[in-house]
Amino acid sequence: MQSYFDELEQVRYEGSQNTNPLAFHHYNPDEIILGKRMADHLRFAACYWHTFCWGGADMFGSNAFERPWQQSGDALALAKRKADVAFEFFHKLNVPYYCFHDVDVSPEGASLKEYLNNFAVMTDVLAEKQASSGVKLLWGTANCFTHPRYGAGAATNPDPEVFSWAATQVFTAMNATQKLGGENYVLWGGREGYETLLNTDLRQEREQIGRFMQMVVEHKHKTGFQGTLLIEPKPQEPTKHQYDYDVATVYGFLKQFGLEKEIKVNIEANHATLAGHSFHHEIASAIALGIFGSVDANRGDPQLGWDTDQFPNSVEENALVMFEILKAGGFTTGGLNFDAKVRRQSTDKYDLFYGHIGAMDTMALALKIAAKMIEDGQLDKQVAERYAGWSSDLGQQILKGKMSLEDLASYAEQHNLNPHHQSGHQELLENRVNRYIFG
């Protein structure tokens, strides 16, 4: 196989003082952090779609990249060439996982039969690539939003035949994910939403997508898939309003359809931005609700109202995110997938490495800082002290349902309660976090 990235052997850790742009400066896979290898904490994955499928087109311009596998020719042969380059990239980046949509790795074809045949061929190709490289599949998913048939959604489409086609894609992609040893399966409702309420039956569409998710869960149990099912929240784009708006909305949906024990969330930083939340908020919310699963690590631009999918570069933001994840016990089947793309002007093929190296170093440094926060214990101590009253006899009786409103009213009167506000010490805590980060 002819090498595509022929000027690079493999990206390696060379230390923070090294100036080699094709080396890691903070990501040392074998470094032990809180008793575990750094690589096992972070569980990095590179995505197929932005890295190997996007041609550099945007709303105002055509493809800007010259990728050999994106030229005209035999679609299946080009898909195999793309797989060659992808696994060369994964190996040279030293990333343990990858992620894909079905049509990222396989030509969709002109019919359902062609789609199924192509995907079967490419699943075997990927299996061979994984076996020879040691790279594993973090998660697979189905693209049920790009094709024109999905203009009005997939599971929420007014046409049950479109619903059925989407079900076929998800059925096939789930089976491929299982065959490839995928540790999760993701459901992102790219067009599960509406443009206008004038032609939308909200209750009908909610029932449709609820039933779709129930069928996904049923299929998981029928086939014995051991991975985690994940929904990826996003508030809008491409639709005006999407039903999986944010973590809290997804949790309400899961509760409605009895799926809160079956499906968790894959949280993307840029989607949190679009929903008007911080990335930290969405991670903490998912953990508090018991549905935290995995992360799409990227960043958005707060001055822009769309999904820019830039590589993460804020140690400050991600240190707090990793702090929450570590406190919750870390990833189980999930990981940090870089759902990010180089900028349209970044046309050098090695820009793909620069973007991922910077992101991996960012998350590695964030992990180290989060570990300092854990080991120091002062942030947790401050929070525990703030809520200490709820460990008292009064607090416990309230929480255990042993006191009614009337009981509390009597208690307050009998004890002549006159509580005073206690400082939240926000500035003190912010200063402490800055010292962890900057020393």
Swiss-Prot record:
GO terms for cellular component: cytoplasm. SUPFAM superfamilies: Xylose isomerase-like. It is found in: Cytoplasm. Binds 2 magnesium ions per subunit. PROSITE patterns: XYLOSE_ISOMERASE. Mg(2+) 1 binds at residues 232, 268, 296, 339. Its cofactor is Mg(2+). One of its GO terms (biological process) is D-xylose metabolic process. One of its GO terms (molecular function) is xylose isomerase activity. InterPro entries: Xyl_isomerase-like_sf, Xylose_isom_bac, Xylose_isomerase. Keywords: Carbohydrate metabolism, Cytoplasm, Isomerase, Magnesium, Metal-binding, Xylose metabolism. The active site is at residues 101, 104. It catalyses: alpha-D-xylose = alpha-D-xylulofuranose. Its EC number is 5.3.1.5. NCBIfam families: PRK05474.1, xylose_isom_A. Belongs to the xylose isomerase family. HAMAP family: Xylose_isom_A (MF_00455). Homotetramer. This is Xylose isomerase. It comes from Yersinia enterocolitica serotype O:8 / biotype 1B (strain NCTC 13174 / 8081). The lineage of its organism: Bacteria, Pseudomonadati, Pseudomonadota, Gammaproteobacteria, Enterobacterales.
